[in-house]
């Protein structure tokens, strides 16, 4: 979360941000603290309700959350729906890690069509260790395992995304590996030029 937030403006007053796959709402709250108007969306109504409840409590105890006039609207639903309108920035933290290369590229393309400045996302980078773990995970019955990570080769993903969005003025920006304990992801920024 800290890496993706570091790629966003410190002052987000007057900017609209989509937190696509908001989970518990931690990133949405930090964007609000910077003054952003945030739409925090997740497929899980349970997570959205948890995020909404935590946010209500945090507003009571942390006056810095609303000091710059930001706001958060929490919603359970499809992050790719055009009904949500346009945004200045979009963040998809760990919401695309279960998808294959083409599906990620399609999602990024759909989001860039409604975004003015940047789309930030994470994906599960291909590595020999993850490839072995992924193969071993397929040995277990589907009902006994958690959602499957899709290890992605960043060079292939780059080709797919660039092919989809380059003609609309989008270019790759920052890229950083994020590791903490067993967690590893690749964070990537695409910017409109």
Segments predicted by a language model, with ranges:
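Conserved alpha-helix/loop element of class I SAM-dependent methyltransferases that forms part
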Residues: 1-13
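Class I SAM-dependent methyltransferase SAM/SAH-binding core
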Residues: 18, 26-65, 69-78
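Conserved glycine-rich SAM-binding loop
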Residues: 23
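Short conserved loop adjoining the S-adenosyl-L-methionine
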Residues: 81-85
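A conserved beta-strand element that flanks and buttresses the S-adenosyl-L-methionine
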Residues: 91
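A short, conserved alpha-helix within the catalytic core of class I
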Residues: 99-110
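Conserved beta-strand signature within the Rossmann-like core of class I S-adenosyl-L-methionine
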Residues: 116-124
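Short alpha-helix
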Residues: 148-166
């Amino acid at each position: 979360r800290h890496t993706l937030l570091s790629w966003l403006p410190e002052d987000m007053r007057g900017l609209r941000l989509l937190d696509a796959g908001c989970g518990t709402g931690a990133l949405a709250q930090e964007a609000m603290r910077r003054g952003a108007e945030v739409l925090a969306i997740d497929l899980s109504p349970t997570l959205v309700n948890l995020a909404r409840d935590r946010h209500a409590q945090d507003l009571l105890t942390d006056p810095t959350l609303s000091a710059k006039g930001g706001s958060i609207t929490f919603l359970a639903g499809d992050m790719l729906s055009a009904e949500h309108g346009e945004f200045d920035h979009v963040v998809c933290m760990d919401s695309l890690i279960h998808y294959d290369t083409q599906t990620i590229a399609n999602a990024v393309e759909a989001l860039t069509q409604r975004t003015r400045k940047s789309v930030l996302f994470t994906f599960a980078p291909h590595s020999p260790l993850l490839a072995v773990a992924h193969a071993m995970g397929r040995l277990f019955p589907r009902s006994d395992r958690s959602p499957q990570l899709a290890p992605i080769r960043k060079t292939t993903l780059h080709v797919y995304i660039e092919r989809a969005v380059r003609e609309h003025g989008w270019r790759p920006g920052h890229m950083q590996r994020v590791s903490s304990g067993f967690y590893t992801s690749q964070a990537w920024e695409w910017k409109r030029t």
